[in-house]
Structure formats: C-alpha cells, structure tokens
Amino acid sequence: MKFVLLFGVFLLTLFSYSSSEMLDDFDQADEDELLSLIEKEEARAKECTPRFYDCSHDRHSCCRTELFKDVCTCFYPKRGDNEVCTCQPPKHLMYMEKAADKAKKFGGKIKKWFG
C-alpha cells in the first residue's frame, strides 16, 4: 500500500511538472502571437484617413479618436452631382467626447485644488 501511495505521489509530481512546462510553452506562444498582432495593428493604424478628409476610396479607413472611431459620411453638396465622402464623428459621439474632455479638465482642477 505504501508503494502504491509513493508511486502515485511520484506520478502526480511528474504530471504537474510536465503540465507546467507545457503551459509555459503555450504562454510564450500567446505572447509571440500578441506581439505580432500589435505590430499589425500599428501598421494598419498608419493608413487611416484623418477627420474631414476624403474617405471615398475606403469607407472603413477613418481614424480613431481617444474614445470613438470616426465614420465615413457621404453627402451631395448643394451645387454638384458628385457624392462627397468625409470622415466625421457622429453627432452624439462628438457631444460625448466634448463632455468627457470637460470632465477631465474639471477633474484636473479638483486635483489641483485638493491635491
């Protein structure tokens, strides 16, 4: 009985060691994959269309602001038959960004007063 118990503890120790080695390998693979995704994201971010610039070539290329992504909005000017598309913030999100900026400024003032 002691032999079975000792053998079981030995197998359990061996199994936990081998599984921890496998988990370390998986963690390293996840980190490498995450780094490659971040590099791709940085490369993609350089090609975005700034706010109020023409986005008719790619309607999904508008840049991201601090909080939200701009949307490609198309319209017809008063004197013209050609459709014009520009990257613009949606009205409700623009108001939310302004409110967030004011809240940050107010928070900075409070921190300055009490901090």
Swiss-Prot record:
Cysteine disulfide links: C48-C63, C55-C72, C62-C87, C74-C85
Residues of the propeptide: 21-44
Tissue specificity as recorded in UniProt: Expressed by the venom gland.
Alphabetical keyword list: Disulfide bond, Knottin, Secreted, Signal, Toxin
Predominant localisation class: secreted
GO CC term (a single one): extracellular region
Molecular function terms from GO: toxin activity
Location in the cell: Secreted
Domain of life: Eukaryota
Matching InterPro entries: Spider_toxin_CSTX_Knottin_CS
Similarity annotation: Belongs to the neurotoxin 19 (CSTX) family. 01 subfamily.
Domain remark text: The presence of a 'disulfide through disulfide knot' structurally defines this protein as a knottin.
Protein name: U3-lycotoxin-Ls1s
UniProt source species: Lycosa singoriensis (Wolf spider)
